[in-house]
Each structure stands twice: as C-alpha cells, then as structure tokens.
Amino acid sequence: MAASSSSFTLCNHTTLRTLPLRKTLVTKTQFSVPTKSSESNFFGSTLTHSSYISPVSSSSLKGLIFAKVNKGQAAPDFTLKDQNGKPVSLKKYKGKPVVLYFYPADETPGCTKQACAFRDSYEKFKKAGAEVIGISGDDSASHKAFASKYKLPYTLLSDEGNKVRKDWGVPGDLFGALPGRQTYVLDKNGVVQLIYNNQFQPEKHIDETLKFLKAA
C-alpha cells in the first residue's frame, strides 16, 4: 500500500511550525459473498441466502403492516380440509367461541410447543365453551401425522397456498420471510374479539387467550 507525505503550517501566535501530514491510501475491504444459494430452517420457514438480495417493495410492506381482519369485525368464512381430509367451514362453529390460531409449520420447535400447550390446556378451553382450531400451510397428511404424534385433540386445517392467511392479512415476520404466528378469538356470533401476535413466545398465545375467555 503506497503512502505519500505532505505538510501544513500551524500558526500558534508567534510560533510557526511545519507538521508532516501523512496521507494514506485506503483500499476497499474485501469480503466474499456466496455465489451459491444456501438454505437454513428457522421456525418452519426455509430461508435462502444468495449474492442477490431483492428489495422489499412497498406493496409487500403494505401486506405486512395492514391487517384485513380486525377486532370488532365479523370473521370471513372459509372452508379448508382438516387432518382427516374432510372439508370444514368456519361457519360450522357459530354459536360458540372459537380460538383460531395461525402457525408457521408442523414439526418445528416453536409450533410444536404451541400445539402441545393448546393440548395441555384443551379442557380449560372446553370448560370456557370454546373450540380450538389450528391453521398452517401444511397438507392434511402432515397435519394427521402431527396430530397423531402429539395426541392433539383439536382440529388442524390445511391452508395450502396460504390463501386464508392472505385473505385475513396475517402479518409475517422478517419482512415476510417467516409466516406469522397469530391467534384470533371469535365470539359465538363469529365476531373477532381478540387478536394476539407473538412469534417467539408461542406458549403465550394459550395464556392470553385463556385469560381473555375467562374475563369475557
């Protein structure tokens, strides 16, 4: 790395001094960027790292920020297949409170904790007269294996393609790279009374919804 010297004059009242000023050439820091894509799994989502990062568009940010289903609004109906492949409509549950929770994926650490926490408190939800329903983008076969392995006593619905998630405006995390974890409590008339979002403390969803149901 080459260097050159120059000088400048410093005036201090009656004393004049010439000080050397060292001029250094700075080169750009070299760092490697992976040219091949690499993948890692994070809470059920596959994140891809490559040398190209696409900018976040304003339209995608709008989808992340603004919910389409809000508190006080009648929840839009939908029909999805359950873990046994049978079609289930949301309107089927009118007349009783419904705890509807969207989660990223079956068999991931956070989602398994959440599912088992709902299982362990299922009798408390039943005592409150509420039905518990889980929704993710996994297919019915995945849900069946997941429910069987962990002995889940409630319904899991398959939202392949995430259509219902998008229709409801469930916000994602990490700029949409990670499917959001959001729970809705509907009253017996199908009106949204509580919306709770907490990606990284999945078991808090059970605490907050039970607290709300007991106070209602």
UniProtKB/Swiss-Prot annotation:
Main localisation: plastid
Disulphide bond pairs: 111-116
Active-site residues, Swiss-Prot/TrEMBL: 111
Single GO MF annotation: thioredoxin-dependent peroxiredoxin activity
Quaternary state and interactors: Monomer; Interacts with the plastidial thioredoxin CDSP32.
Cellular compartment(s): Plastid, Chloroplast thylakoid lumen
Function: Thiol-specific peroxidase that catalyzes the reduction of hydrogen peroxide and organic hydroperoxides to water and alcohols, respectively. Plays a role in cell protection against oxidative stress by detoxifying peroxides. Involved in the photosystem II protection against hydrogen peroxide.
Organism of provenance: Arabidopsis thaliana
Name assigned to this protein: Peroxiredoxin Q, chloroplastic
PANTHER family: AHPC_TSA FAMILY PROTEIN (PTHR42801:SF4), THIOREDOXIN-DEPENDENT PEROXIDE REDUCTASE (PTHR42801)
